[in-house]
Amino acid sequence: MRKEILAKAMAGRRLTAEEALDAGRSLAAGRTEHLHCAAFLAALAARGETAEELAGLAAAFREAVSPMRAFPDAIDTCGTGGDGRHTFNLSTAAALVVASLGVTVAKHGNRSVSSSCGSADLLERAGVPVDGSPSDAEERLTRQGFAFLFAPRFHPAMAHVAPVRRALGARTAFNLLGPLLNPAGVRRQVVGVFSKEGAVLVADALAALGVERALVVFGEGGYDEAVLHGRVHVIDIEGGDISRYHLGPSDFGLPPGRPEDLAGGGSEENAALLDELFEGRGPRGLRHAVAANAALALSVSGKAGELREGVGLAEDAMTSGRARRFLESLRADDMGVRRAQVS
């Protein structure tokens, strides 16, 4: 890393996007000593990262991603995680529901870091392939309309900063980068963020990186998902325009929920809950929460014009068996299975 960039960061001064890009390239290439990497990340965190810095770092690590064919019409529901709530994997379940309805989903994610069960942990326990190569992901997206993009498989450059992040043991810019690094080049996203301030940063960075449409959400009470027991803070990005608003249960056409509706456990417990939901017999409050998050993704994809329409589609997918049949097709990992077969 260039000494003048490190010195500027340590002096508490903001970096330009170009300087952050330069620093990110050095980090991604493993050219920065661990001590300097730690000083850089700690300095940004102490002062507070800017959207320009986040976008610059993201651009650098996008350059270092394991290459795969772009799927710009696909969507992603990858969030930051890190809310510490140990809830059920709402965004992962919602991604499967949305994919069962014919929307191509390139689900970016990882194993658990601060939660009891990460997206990769849940899907693996549910029998869905999670550790495929880029070519495997391309094939699954083309044939089945869903692929899990396991972050460590697609971002080998992250290994250069992983020891530093573990040693620091505190949040850094990298806790916000995940949703900005989808390897499939998606242009439409729903991103849950663990704090209101983080949501603003992620939204502004997504806009700077040229996202076509995104909903960045923060659930009141500290949730990185849409919730039904409080307001959902939404930052809506469309074609470069950014708007902010709140959503409540009535906007989804659903009754108010309770925090305990979202309770999850380890991978075994959450996989069992997923099966129950997709068999139409899961806890009603949890099913409503999954439907609300799926509705956001259906809206972003253009599949549903209104949130209430999206909720109806999602509820039907879960109660009719459509989502269950789609999940079974993923478990079979039959590359010849097409979505038409689960219609």
Where are these predicted regions, by residue range?
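N-terminal glycine-rich anion-binding loops that anchor highly charged ligand groups
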Residues: 1, 9-55, 62-70, 289
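N-terminal basic/disordered segments at the start of proteins
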Residues: 1-13, 77-85
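Glycine-rich anion-binding loops and their surrounding alpha/beta cores
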Residues: 8, 14-15, 63-66, 87, ...
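Short glycine-rich or small-residue beta-strand-to-loop segments that form or flank ligand, phosphate
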Residues: 10, 41-45, 76-81, 297
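Short, small-residue-enriched loops and turns at beta-alpha junctions
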Residues: 27, 45-48, 81-86, 112-114, ...
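Short amphipathic alpha-helical face segments that pack within enzyme cores
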Residues: 39, 93-97, 289, 293-296
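A glycine-rich phosphate/pyrophosphate-binding beta-strand-loop-alpha-helix module
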Residues: 41, 88-144
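Active-site cofactor/substrate anionic-group-binding motifs, chiefly glycine-
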Residues: 48-112
